């Protein structure tokens, strides 16, 4: 009787191990398939592309008073995908997890002020560049910060996973040397700017497009000050899985069309007051 119970327990344990191993193997092959496979046939069958966005990132992708997705990137994505006979399904994502969301197949694209850089190019396949921006420091006029050197010993905020923070954290970065400490990280820029206004931060490292739009829509825009950084120009691109070669090529062709027919300039005029840059 005892021997029978032991054999029964061993069988249960053995079966459990087999199930776990099979699940791990299945998950591995599912991950590899999602990550490496060209999904164009599935995309055309669904007629929909899932686009990951940070829905607080004005004016690129955000929600209006009615809760609808709006913004420069949102309208550009819709116009571009329409050229391809597809629709966009916008999904809010944690910006610090954007590449993971893409790799695991939860989204098909990252399209939301996504700066192209060497680190990200290792993880995703970028479209051609469609917009350019740069990093700035936003502070309050009462902080008496007029140039980058005035940030010595100050409390600087930035968004987790943002291109500005990535550059700030690079070895030898001159701004980091000036500040002398890590940047305080936030999951969204609006939270950092709120802390700036109540005095918990001295400055925020942020995209110029975001800063300009945010400040212009504040009750007292004159209370803010913007200082240029020496980070250079950021080129925005659409991030896709490396295996999605066909999708990437189709996006590039459609982006070229919306540039040529003036659609992108109309969208840019709406959100920035200028033609696309």
Where do the model's predicted regions map?
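Extracytoplasmic small-molecule ligand-binding "clamshell" domains
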Residues: 10-16, 36-113, 261
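Ligand-binding clefts/hinges and TM-proximal coupling segments of bilobed small-molecule sensing domains
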Residues: 21-38, 45, 163-183, 222-226, ...
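Ligand-binding cleft/hinge of the Venus flytrap
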Residues: 63-64, 77-86, 164-186, 215-220
């Amino acid at each position: 009787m005892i021997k029978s119970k032991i054999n029964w327990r061993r069988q249960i344990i053995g079966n459990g191990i087999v199930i776990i191993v099979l699940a791990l193997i299945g998950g591995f092959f599912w991950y590899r398939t999602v990550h490496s496979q060209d999904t164009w046939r599935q995309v055309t069958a669904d007629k929909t592309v899932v686009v990951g966005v940070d829905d607080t990132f004005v004016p690129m992708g955000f929600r209006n008073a009615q809760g609808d997705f709006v913004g420069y990137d949102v309208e550009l994505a819709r116009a571009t995908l329409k050229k391809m006979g597809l629709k966009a399904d916008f999904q809010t994502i944690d910006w610090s997890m954007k590449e993971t969301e893409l790799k695991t197949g939860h989204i098909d694209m990252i399209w939301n002020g996504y700066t192209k850089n060497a680190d990200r190019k290792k993880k995703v396949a970028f479209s051609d560049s469609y917009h350019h921006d740069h990093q700035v420091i936003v502070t309050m006029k009462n902080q008496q910060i007029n140039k980058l050197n005035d940030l010595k010993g100050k409390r600087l905020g930035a968004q987790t996973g943002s291109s500005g923070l990535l550059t700030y954290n690079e070895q030898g970065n001159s701004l980091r040397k000036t500040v002398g400490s890590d940047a305080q990280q936030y999951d969204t820029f609006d939270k950092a700017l709120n802390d700036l206004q109540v005095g918990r931060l001295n400055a925020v490292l942020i995209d110029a497009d975001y800063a300009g739009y945010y400040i212009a829509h504040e009750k007292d825009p004159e209370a803010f000050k913007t200082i240029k950084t020496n980070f250079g120009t950021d080129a925005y691109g659409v991030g896709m899985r490396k295996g999605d070669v066909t999708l990437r090529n189709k996006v590039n062709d459609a982006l070229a069309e919306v540039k040529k027919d003036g659609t992108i300039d109309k969208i840019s005029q709406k959100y920035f007051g200028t033609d696309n840059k």
